[in-house]
UniProtKB/Swiss-Prot annotation:
GO terms for cellular component: cytoplasm; small ribosomal subunit. It comes from Spiroplasma kunkelii. One of its GO terms (molecular function) is structural constituent of ribosome. Keywords: Ribonucleoprotein, Ribosomal protein, RNA-binding, rRNA-binding. Residues 72-91 are annotated as: Disordered. NCBIfam families: rpsS_bact. This is Small ribosomal subunit protein uS19. Protein S19 forms a complex with S13 that binds strongly to the 16S ribosomal RNA. Coiled coil: none annotated. The lineage of its organism: Bacteria, Bacillati, Mycoplasmatota, Mollicutes, Entomoplasmatales. Belongs to the universal ribosomal protein uS19 family. PROSITE patterns: RIBOSOMAL_S19. Residues 82-91 have a biased composition (Basic and acidic residues). InterPro entries: Ribosomal_uS19, Ribosomal_uS19_bac-type, Ribosomal_uS19_CS, Ribosomal_uS19_SF. GO terms for biological process: ribosomal small subunit assembly; translation.
Length: 91
């Protein structure tokens, strides 16, 4: 189920304040965040976010195509180890 249109998109306030401060100072720093639920706004373009995936922070560089998506979509939480090998074929 998607979010109600009358509520609008969600962004953590501390994250938005950090980006606004970087934009006013014209700095490009990596912003470390645990907020995977925050929606990407146009002000975020050109910034790099270190998004936590449960174990480590994955760097995510924001481009125009990412607007409207959530930060967590670009930081996978599961690691695919591959399917098991067939031991009969190895001989």
């Amino acid at each position: 189920m998607s979010r109600s249109l009358k509520k609008g998109p969600f962004v953590d306030k501390y994250l938005q304040k950090k980006v606004e401060a970087l934009n006013t100072a014209n700095k490009k720093e990596v912003v470390k965040t645990w907020s995977r639920r925050s929606v990407i706004f146009p002000e975020f373009i050109g910034h790099t976010f270190a998004v936590h995936n449960g174990k480590e922070h994955i760097p995510v560089y924001v481009t125009e195509d990412m607007i409207g998506h959530k930060l967590g979509e670009f930081s996978p939480t599961r690691k695919f180890g591959g399917h098991g090998d067939d031991k009969k074929k190895k001989k």
